[in-house]
């Protein structure tokens, strides 16, 4: 049986943030995994990736177990005692953990490292600049709650 991971988001940054969860799933099964994503260039050189395909090709695989990241919980809510609803919102937690939580686990601090491997030659434009690339600018973000407590 092939283990597959469907990264169910079209956003590039959110797709990159799925890398630690994909790696952990691969390690849990002790096998390389098939990746289904709209951003295959991010996963082409990952050592734990068996193959990288567009999500439309999932149905062509026989004997495959698919782990669907992100989509199963984004926007979902549950009702608390008393009727108040709580919504799963990825803007309120680390997006890397959001992918993991969609599979029922969390990542340790050591597992949160996000590595993008670029070992294949890339196509150059006429002026010698790489045509397609990803720039990652790690930084700190703003606080989720920015309004005064008195409100």
Predicted segments, located by residue:
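Catalytic machinery of carbohydrate-active enzymes
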Residues: 1-151
């Amino acid at each position: 049986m092939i283990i597959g991971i469907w990264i169910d988001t079209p956003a590039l940054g959110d797709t990159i943030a799925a890398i630690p969860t994909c790696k952990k799933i691969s390690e849990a099964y002790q096998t390389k995994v098939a990746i289904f994503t709209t951003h295959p260039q991010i996963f082409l050189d990952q050592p734990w990736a068996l193959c990288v395909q567009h999500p439309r090709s999932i149905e062509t695989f026989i004997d495959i177990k698919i782990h669907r990241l992100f989509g199963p919980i984004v926007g979902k809510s549950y009702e608390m005692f008393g009727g108040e609803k709580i919504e799963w919102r990825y803007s309120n937690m680390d997006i890397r953990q959001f992918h993991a939580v969609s599979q029922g686990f969390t990542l340790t601090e050591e597992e949160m490292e996000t590595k993008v491997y670029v070992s294949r030659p890339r196509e150059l434009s006429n002026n010698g600049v790489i045509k397609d690339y990803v720039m990652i600018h790690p930084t700190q973000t703003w606080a989720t709650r920015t309004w005064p407590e008195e409100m």
